[in-house]
Amino acid sequence: MAYSNQSRVTEFIISGLTNKPELQLPLFLLFLGIYLFTVLGNLGMIILILLSSHLHTPMYFFLSSLSFIDLCYSTIITPKMLVNFVTTKNVISYQECMTQLYFFIAFVISECHMLAAMAYDRYVAICNPLLYNVTMSYQVCSWMVGGVYGMGFIGAAIHTFCMLRVVFCKDNIINHYFCDLFPLMELACSSTYVNEVVLLSLSAFNIFIPTLTILGSYIFIIISILRIKSTEGRFKAFSTCSSHFSAVSVFFGSLAFMYLQPFSVSSKDKGKVSSVFYTTIVPMLNPMIYSLRNRDVKLALNKLFQKKKFHV
């Protein structure tokens, strides 16, 4: 009741990545390049999989879903950040902030579980190839992807509902480059205890469960790879798995650094740097990592270019 007589915040000011004017233009150009690369890479991957009939398999169904998620949550964050680099007052309304928060959380949680689903798919393909078509049927894959999005949007709804209960009074400067949970909680003039408990609980679930699934899958995959008699075959398999595992490690490592710590000890500036990895760097790298050494993707690209040449 004490908050009813105080003026409520109707808009926030986003401080951005840095307050140094001389860095605004270089950072704008850098992140514009990253975003364009992200859009082209992920959109290109989705279109390529849709147009290539031999890529209509569970593995590429998951990969196209991952590309869609990367495209969505980088688009939720980066365009607004780019605008903020070239404007003097970086304002976002309360409603826009909560909307950005909701969709960002939804797609980040979805990515966590999508990576786990992809790791499980690779485990079945390598360790149980004879049962692959039965285990990873179209119906099973559809249910898995539906479950991934379901967990993402339900988790986001819980976080956003908790944030809507928080009262913001005078302070409205978000020390971040987008509307995220910790920076918003720092501005609250009401208790955020429930938010902190929910954040730590859901973060632990959405980071640890997929991480354990991925680790378990890769352990069995590595055991299978070690049984390959060909040295060249083992090297190719290890190099592919290591690149996949590196991308997953960067994503989950930066998420864990940001969210798996008490609110009281969270570092503001280090949090910004950590956020850059999972909001901009990983979505840009994923299309390259999952397709660079992929023979099927290269074959699909060659066929697509040959069709274009033939029609010309």
UniProtKB/Swiss-Prot annotation:
Domain of life (superkingdom): Eukaryota
Alphabetized UniProt keyword annotations: Cell membrane, Disulfide bond, G-protein coupled receptor, Glycoprotein, Membrane, Olfaction, Receptor, Sensory transduction, Transducer, Transmembrane, Transmembrane helix
Extracellular compartment segments: 1-28, 78-99, 165-204, 266-274
Disulphide bridges, residue numbers: 97-189
Cytoplasmic side: 50-56, 121-143, 226-244, 293-312
A UniProt-annotated Pfam family: 7tm_4
Protein name stated in the entry: Olfactory receptor 8G50
Organism: Mus musculus (Mouse)
